[in-house]
Amino acid sequence: MSDNNVQKKSNPLSQWFRQPKIFVKLPSSGNYYPAGSLDKSTTGEYPVYAMTAKDELMFKTPDALLSGQSTVEVIKSCIPAIQDPWTMPSLDIDAALIAIRIATYGENMGVEANCPHCEHLNEYDIDLVKWLDSINAWKFVPEVEIPPLIIHVRPYTYKELSQTSLKTLEHQRIFNVINNEEMSDEDKVERFGKSFIKLTELTVDIIAGCVAKITTPDGDVTDQEQIQEFIRNSPRDVFDTVSKHITDMKENIELPIQHVACNECLKEFDMPVTMDQSNFFAVRS
């Protein structure tokens, strides 16, 4: 069989396939991506396509939402330059999802909120372009100074962030065990102990994995096993400082609380807007 015969036949409909709707700059500037996980742009801007029907269905699949798989598949579909979204730095996730929503539904997002004063259901429009610009203006701080050490950190990957979200569910399971009146006290203690150990180990491993290098008065330490051992054996204040720095860096670029006024009673209140994909992509402006 000739090479011409085995080549994939070009689709005459390809000229009507999706085209990029917008271009987005990533807050990380393309840093912190492992080799092969990002097709780096020379301009720093990446094409963003609107979601397909399949992409929208992904955000309606509970199991895929819970595991993070839906987010991974949609980012791969709509921002193909990000070839392995599991390894993308967490500081790029919100920017990517906002850009995808803009490309799919437009620059404004309609949200609803009940007034805490009169219970009136209000509707507001959020300017996502303004939001995206504010995210891109933010810079990640890669060093934590704990004299005489300097801890060099990287942001969570999306995989690690998903594991952190699952950790929250594990917390809930622990509380459910404690409040389960049908279980004996011995069973409660045993299951609580196992869950707590699992949760603690996951937390420590994720934080240790975000430490790329430690600068000491005697030089730099980059060996990951040695860094893991240090994190596991460091004083609590050292661990808490590193953990808080990494977490704060992520929270600093999350969608800010909106200060709004009720359309009925005119009183003002704070309205949180989340990046929970199940509602972020369900509400169209």
Q: Model-derived features: where do they sit?
A:
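Long C-terminal interaction/binding lobes of large macromolecular proteins
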Residues: M1-S285
